[in-house]
Amino acid sequence: MKERGPGGTPNQEFTDPEREQRRQQELLDGTNLLPELLKERMPALYSQEHERDPLVAVKYFDPVGSWTWYATEGSPVDEDGYMDTDKLKVDYLFFGLMVGFEPELGYFSLNELKTAKEGLRGLRALPIERDIHFRAQRLSEVKRRHHIS
């Protein structure tokens, strides 16, 4: 949100520093799976489809299991899973690498990550988190770390 600067003249506008600080703080909360700044920086679905080695933007993980999700792209979608409609966008669809029972490239949604642990109890019920220490890197590097050819 822009506010008028000192003197109130239009050419002295600046960004609300509290809002920016709040947006930066959101990045440090691993339980916030898709903070505003990350959403803005996420490459749109299909934007890297012709890249040989796409950039991985975000990593999600099960804190008590072995499942990990690496998103290379993502876009808001409507209730039917479509991006290009005038309908209300109610979910976020990612494409990337999922490492669980066996590694695979495919689609997963923010809703799936949020509800993956429903019905579980105890430690197994700990929700999926976003790795706040993960830095964007090429998919080939992620595959190498997981010993995936």
Protein language model features and the residues they cover:
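Hydrophobic/aromatic-rich, well-ordered segments within soluble, folded domains that form packed cores
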Residues: A57-D78
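Catalytic Cys-His active-site segments of thiol-dependent hydrolases/isopeptidases
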Residues: D80-E102
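Intrinsically disordered, low-complexity segments enriched in small/polar residues
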Residues: E3-P6, L28, E79, F94, ...
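Extracellular structured ligand-interaction cores
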Residues: L55, S66, D91-L93
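Helix-rich interaction surfaces within compact, conserved domain-sized segments
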Residues: G96, F101-S149
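N-terminal domain-onset segments
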Residues: M1-P63, H147-S149
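Intrinsic disorder/low-complexity signal
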Residues: K2, Q12-P17, M83-T85, V90, ...
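Short linear motifs in intrinsically disordered
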Residues: E40-H50, A71-L88
